[in-house]
């Protein structure tokens, strides 16, 4: 309902997703104040220029305890996002890119992670996420993530680069990161539309100093400047917490036997999969 008199002047009230909302036009059609009541969601839109073909403006808001801010350009075919900032106690990032609206929804973003609390990963519910297969198959996305450790940070990872491609439910990830000058690379792919998605992976570790790397994990090792090269291929079922190793190679002198692969499988599942799939992201368990 729209009110244009009294203390509710220039106010629109209604209901969406079972929650009441209120929009205040601020006596100016270029400024909109939106609140979804009893949810902690509030958005303020400021349009600096708009016509039938293009809208330019910025957005500020709060989603629960998180603050967001961004400039944008909308022209019916796409939304160009500039200087997007997300700030929250456990997660902060900056992002820029384009969201294509026609003929299909496609998201292309470059995102720099400023801060991430690993505890957030423990709260990920993959099973609930995979229940939205009808939505997942309609999303096409190309997203680049980057992270660089700040000075005096306690983060184990020095830097991280990740490319994520999602198209028609098929997810491909290229990931590389460094820990104490040792380089990790991992490529993976999976079909999220399958009843039990299986992730195929091919991962490599290249280290020129095994001692320096292990020290990051509080593991003592005697010899300096000893190289460590590991290649691991396999697949894992992200809902059943099961993994199968196709091959494991260490340096030039070790190739895992069938019995070794079975041992690594059981050890991996008992330690890293003790609760759920996301435990593989907790480096302290390695």
Feature locations, PLM:
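Membrane-proximal interfacial segments on either side of biological membranes
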Residues: 1-180, 184-286
